[in-house]
Amino acid sequence: MNQEAKKIATSLYGRVNVPAVERCRVNFCTDLEKSVLMSNFERRGWNQVGPDDEWNFYWASTQTCRSLFSVESGYRMNDNQMINHFPNHYELSRKDLLVKNIKRYRKELEREGSLLAEKAEVVLPGGQVVTRYIHLDFVPITFVLPADYNMFVEEYRKSPQSTWIMKPCGKSQGTGIFLINKLSKLKKWSREAKTPFHPQLSKESYVISRYIDNPLLIGGKKFDLRLYVLVTSFRPLKAYLFQLGFCRFCTVKYDTSVTELDNMYVHLTNVSVQKHGGDYNSIHGGKMSVENLRLYLEGTRGRAVTEKLFAAMQWLIVHSLKAVAPVMANDRHCFECYGYDIIIDNQLKPWLVEVNASPSLTSTTVNDRILKYKLIDNILSVVLPPDGVPDVRWNKLPNAEALGSFELLIDEELLEKDEPSSGVRGRNSKYK
């Protein structure tokens, strides 16, 4: 980055936490030499070292993190080391485990007699009456295949005109996803892919979810939201929402006809899919800011329902985190930024599609680069003490300036202490 660019970056992104006299005290290591990462580390005057050297801060891939925390590695971190993933992040980011944890969370709340687990009867499009959760119905009905195949067939037959979406559990960026509207299509795929629906025979797990076939459309096109959520602790739960998320649009107008069922440019919003389409626009990258979405909805639907929608999105994020908190390895050296993918239906109800433990830091447009640079800058400001040097003994209570574009979603420690703090508890209290 040249000197002029550095000046612009400084004015755009605000303060640099680390005092000049201490800027060389931090050694960083990374597997992902993305420009938004490297420029943030360099701006702080950090020194790059290798994984076998004495590092303070490691921005690692999920594979490196798993290897580092494995019993075989024998590696033990000291108080001045931090890493950007929790050891078993996959409890949230693997599609099958996320579903399992949310189902367990609901059952536990039911056993406790919690009002959160209240249910009500719902009439399906085909006229069938089913029971659904009132407050925790934020994930489309989902089954893990092959284990839940018989349960899936039972649910499918309740509403045979429904469309379902099939996804491999451990893959991302739209890989291996397809839609079905007939059991015969699923069976045909099983034969051709040589993936039998038998728990002992299948080598790979899939999730199959009821497809949200009534998405909110803008300009006739389907979109989803990518929101960034920073977790600094799971027990007690402490999480922040980045306010500069974005919408990702399909390049082709939405069409529910059977002939378009296999057209992924109609149904999948992933940039990795859409950028190969003939209608992809490399200037805006098929993206719109969440702030512009809010303004659009306030103008077309009204402020009250828009506020309700955004509150509902925060609600589903918090409860998805609460669902996995009991099983997460809560290592004090760790923090993690998750990419939440959410679809809004035409009734303005948000649905959680999936959670990514390694949201892309590749910049596809100028605005993308600005947003992701600021995301990394703000993450570093939140997870590091005021002097900018990693220290796990720090109480992880960043001040308002350090939050940047993050807002506190939940801090269970503050709730438990019942200490009002600059209005923060008021924002948290609904998640008790």
Q: Model-predicted segments: where are they?
A:
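A residue-level signal for conserved active-site and pocket-lining positions in enzyme catalytic cores
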Residues: 41, 98, 142, 208, ...
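Conserved aromatic-histidine-acidic binding/catalytic patches
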Residues: 25-29, 86-90, 215, 305, ...
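A short, surface-exposed helix-loop junction/capping segment
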Residues: 14-22, 78-81, 288-303
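Conserved N-proximal alpha/beta basic substrate-recognition cap immediately N-terminal to
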Residues: 6-18, 24-172, 179-185, 191-192
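Glycine-rich phosphate/pyrophosphate-binding beta-alpha loops
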Residues: 356-364
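A short beta-strand motif that forms the metal-chelation/ATP-contact edge
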Residues: 342-344, 349-357
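Polybasic/polar functional segments that serve as interface/processing modules
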Residues: 281-284, 419-432
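Catalytic core of tubulin tyrosine ligase-like
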Residues: 151, 155, 159-337, 347-350, ...
